Amino acid sequence: MSATDLDPTDLDLAELRAERARLQTLDDAVSYVRRLAQARLDLAMAEKTARVTGEAVISSGDVTGELPRLLGSHLTGGAARPPRPAEDFSDHPLAIELDELCSDAGSADLPTLTDDQLGEYMTALTEFEHRVSLQRKQVFERLDALSAELVRRYRDGEASVAGLLDD
């Protein structure tokens, strides 16, 4: 039985903190990959819109100039939690899977894809993003349970804030 299967009340304080830290890192990685998938889907949707309107949104081979405008809809007023030091998640298995999905679809040059290829690519991205979102939700639920147990232990005196300074 792994730490992720255990009831948080069965973990000692060190295990509880370690599992919470591990899941926070996993959440960061999953969130990063989810944002990448959403950005790639935004680019594909912009290409699809350009085909319908007849106005080139992405010039062939050069997307970089359009990125702020195309991806601006995902920018928010701030983080929902305090920021943690950023890590490079480009080698995370989900990031590699997304890169392979995009490479297999020929997404490097969206304007050269046929309408059918673009549609298939968008479907694959949407399915991938939904799967990653579900995984992220499951990580959040586990983090919430671990955090609630930590709070309970501090509140009930089973753990002390002074103990954090000793760690």
Regions found by a protein language model. Name each.
Residues M1-D167:
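Charge-rich amphipathic alpha-helical interaction elements
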